[in-house]
C-alpha cells in the first residue's frame, strides 16, 4: 500500500526492478551509451519490412531479453506496461500480443517511461499487500 504525500506516493515496501534490457539501432550504436545496450543493429529496421514492424521487433526483443535476464518465464507475467509513439500503441500491442502477456498500453509521449514506472510500482505494491488475503 502506498501513502500519498502531495503528488508523491510513498511505498511501505519499496518496489524493485529485477532486470532491464535495451535494444538499439545504428544511431544508438554510434552514441556514448552504446556499451549500455544489450543488443545493437546497424540496420535501423532490424531486417523488418517497415518502421512499424521494426518498432514491434524492438519491443519484443527487449521484453524477451529482460525476461531472460530476470529468469522469469513469460507465463508468470501478470501485467506488462508498455508504450510507444505510434498511433494507439501499435508496436507495443503487437509485441505484447506475440509475447502472450496481459498488457496495458501507455501513451504519454516523453512521459511514458515515468508513467510506466509509477503505475508498475503502485500495482506491485497493491498486489504484494493483498497477497495474504488469498
Q: What function would you assign to each model-found segment?
A:
Residues 127-134:
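Conserved small/polar residues in nucleotide/adenosyl-binding loops
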Residues 104-110, 114-117:
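Cysteine-centered functional microenvironments
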Residues 72, 122-126:
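Secondary-structure boundary motif
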Residues 62-66, 116-123:
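Buried hydrophobic packing segments
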Residues 83-88, 110-111, 133:
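Acidic, glycine-rich active-site loops and adjacent beta-strand->loop/helix elements
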Residues 1-104:
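Conserved "HGTGT" condensation-loop signature of ketosynthase/thiolase-family condensing enzymes
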Amino acid at each position: 500500500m502506498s501513502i500519498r504525500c502531495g503528488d508523491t506516493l510513498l511505498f511501505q515496501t519499496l518496489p524493485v526492478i529485477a532486470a532491464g534490457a535495451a535494444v538499439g539501432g545504428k544511431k544508438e550504436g554510434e552514441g556514448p551509451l552504446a556499451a549500455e545496450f544489450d543488443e545493437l543493429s546497424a540496420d535501423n529496421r532490424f531486417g523488418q519490412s517497415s518502421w512499424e514492424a521494426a518498432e514491434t521487433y524492438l519491443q519484443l526483443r527487449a521484453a524477451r531479453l529482460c525476461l531472460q535476464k530476470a529468469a522469469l518465464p513469460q507465463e508468470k507475467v501478470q501485467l506488462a506496461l508498455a508504450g510507444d509513439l505510434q498511433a494507439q500503441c501499435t508496436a507495443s500491442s503487437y509485441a505484447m500480443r506475440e509475447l502472450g502477456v496481459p498488457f496495458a498500453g501507455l501513451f504519454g509521449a516523453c512521459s511514458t517511461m515515468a508513467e510506466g514506472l509509477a503505475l508498475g510500482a503502485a500495482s506491485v505494491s497493491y498486489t504484494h499487500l493483498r497477497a495474504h488475503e488469498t
